[in-house]
Design a protein with these regions (language model features):
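C-terminal helical subdomain
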Residues: 180, 196-233
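Short alpha-helical oligomerization interface
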Residues: 96-107
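Residue(s) in the substrate-gating loop at a strand-loop-helix junction
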Residues: 140
Length: 254
């Protein structure tokens, strides 16, 4: 069981899962919250709500694809309060699979995660005390198997899922916990644009509650809801001829 998660940094905190997580940590004893997002008004609103719950909260509009800016931001706040949890949550959907959108998806969903996780890991390695040192990465159920409705999105999430799983094992000896989150369809600005069916759709606060409990228990892979997790896992182990047949009958647009 993880204890003393007092200083928390969350990217993509101005909506969806990130916003809901910020509120949960503010309501459950976090002393310092450092939040980033792309929308000033929404970010200011969530900062104010977290402060009402008693957490000292600072927000910053920052582009996670900016490596130098992310390093500076993370180091700056670690000096103010030794970080216990760094949550690489920011991500985008692809929309139409144009070259521009494809590159943007990988830059944000993959490089954005690396730009968040890498400086945090280096800071954690230098810390020799017993305080909590946690990395959390938001991947997706779509990362279990490439979905025809979103090739770039699925591939980007598969990349960070595999990265997180490997990182968890490689950092175990350093007493650094790594949790990989693979949610299904959760209310966010991304799913608000979806026109395809979204089975087992979940509100952000419910999803955040599952994630919070999973991190507290240090569960390596927090994937939900379980019917979707089982379904995509099953598809991933089927022979290609069968999985191709099934996918040919699924929606080709998200």
């Amino acid at each position: 069981m993880q204890k003393n998660i007092e200083n928390v940094l969350i990217t993509g905190a101005s909506s969806g899962i990130g916003e809901a997580l910020a509120l949960i940590y503010a309501q459950n004893g976090a002393k310092n919250l450092f939040l980033s997002g792309r929308n000033v008004e929404r970010l200011e609103k969530i900062v104010a709500e977290c402060q009402k719950s008693g957490a000292k909260t600072e927000g910053k509009v920052i582009d996670v694809t900016d490596k130098a800016a992310m390093e500076k931001w993370i180091e700056e706040f670690n000096q103010k309060a030794s970080l216990n949890l760094v949550f690489a949550n920011a991500g985008v959907s692809t929309g139409e699979e144009t070259p521009k959108n494809i590159y943007n998806t990988f830059n944000t969903n993959v490089m954005g995660v690396l730009n968040t996780v890498t400086p945090a890991v280096e800071l954690y390695k230098k810390r020799k005390n017993d305080s909590a040192k946690i990395i959390a990465i938001t991947a997706s159920i779509a990362g279990y198997h490439g979905l025809c409705a979103g090739p770039s999105y699925s591939a980007s999430k598969a990349c960070i899922k595999a990265y997180g799983e490997a990182l968890r094992n490689s950092l175990r000896a350093e007493n650094i916990a790594v949790n990989i989150i693979c949610p299904g369809f959760v209310r966010s600005r991304i799913t608000d644009k979806n026109t395809c069916p979204m089975p087992f759709f979940m509100e952000a606060d419910k999803a955040a509650g599952i994630i919070y409990k999973g991190i507290q228990k240090n569960i390596g892979l927090i994937a939900f809801p379980w019917p979707m997790r089982f379904g995509v896992w099953l598809l991933s182990i089927l022979p290609n001829c069968l999985s191709d047949f099934i996918y040919s009958r699924l929606p080709h647009k998200v």
